[in-house]
Amino acid sequence: MFPDIRFIVGIIGSVACMLLYSAPILTFKRVIKKASVEEFSCIPYILALFSCLTYSWYGFPVVSYGWENMTVCSISSLGVLFEGTFISIYVWFAPRGKKKQVMLMASLILAVFCMTVFFSSFSIHNHHIRKVFVGSVGLVSSISMYGSPLVAMKQVIRTKSVEFMPFYLSLFTLFTSLTWMAYGVIGRDPFIATPNCIGSIMGILQLVVYCIYSKCKEAPKVLHDIEQANVVKIPTSHVDTKGHNP
C-alpha cells in the first residue's frame, strides 16, 4: 500500500515541479528581448543544475534500490534540461566578465558531479554506502540553495514591497516542498525528506513575510533585480520570485 501511495505522491510532486521548472521562462524571454542579462544572477540556476544532476543519478538503480525513486530520476532529468537551457541563454547574452564567471562555475559543478558518478560507480561497491554517499552530495547541493529565498525576504523587508515575491509562487513553493517531503517520509529517505523539510519551512516564512508586507502601501524602492533569488529544491529545482518557478 505504501509504495503505491508514495508513487502517487511522487507523481503529484513531479507535476508541481514541471510548473516550477517552467516558471523562469518569463525571465529569459525578457533577457532575449532586451539582449541583456542586466543585473540578473545565474548562480541559482547553476546550483539548481547541480541538484538536478545529483538527484537524477540518485534515482538510478545504480544508486537507489531498483526504480524506487523513478519519479525523482525522471523529474530531475527534466530539470537538467530546463536549467541547462537557462544557463546557455544567460551565457549567450552575458557580458564577457559574467560569461567567464558562469562558465567557470558551471564547469566546476559538472566536474564535481562527474567525480561523484565515477567514485560512486567504481570505488564504492556496497550499494547502501553508495546511496548514502550520493544522497549526501545531493543533500549538500540542495541546502546550499536555500540562501536565495532569504535574499528575497530580505529585499521585501527592506523595501516593504512584495513585488518580487508573488503570493502564488510562495504558496506553490510550499506545496511542492511539502509534497516531496511526504514522498521522502513515506519512503523513509532522509536525503529527500530533509532538504524539502527545510524548503517547507522557508515557504512558510515567505508566506508570513508576504502577509505582513502585502498590506504596506509604501512605494517600493529601486532595487537590483532578484527574480532568480527564490530557489526551491524538489527534490530539486528552483523558482524565481517575480511572477513568472524539481
Swiss-Prot record:
Record domain MtN3/slv: where: 7-96, 133-217
Keyword Glycoprotein (UniProt): yes
Taxonomic placement: Eukaryota, Viridiplantae, Streptophyta, Embryophyta, Tracheophyta
Membrane topology label: Multi-pass membrane protein
Segments on the Extracellular face: 1-6, 64-74, 123-131, 188-191
Residues carrying a glycan: N69
GO molecular function: sugar transmembrane transporter activity
Reported function: Mediates both low-affinity uptake and efflux of sugar across the plasma membrane.
Alphabetic keyword roster: Cell membrane, Glycoprotein, Membrane, Repeat, Sugar transport, Transmembrane, Transmembrane helix, Transport
Protein name as catalogued: Bidirectional sugar transporter SWEET3a
Chief location of this protein within or outside the cell: membrane
Regions of this protein lying in the Cytoplasmic compartment: 28-42, 96-101, 153-166, 213-246
UniProt record similarity statement: Belongs to the SWEET sugar transporter family.
GO biological process assignments: carbohydrate transport
A Gene Ontology cellular-component term: plasma membrane
PANTHER family per record: BIDIRECTIONAL SUGAR TRANSPORTER SWEET3A, RAG1-ACTIVATING PROTEIN 1
Pfam families per UniProt: MtN3_slv
Residues annotated as transmembrane: 7-27, 43-63, 75-95, 102-122, 132-152, 167-187, 192-212
InterPro entries: SWEET, SWEET_rpt
Subunit relationships: Forms homooligomers and/or heterooligomers.
Subcellular location: Cell membrane
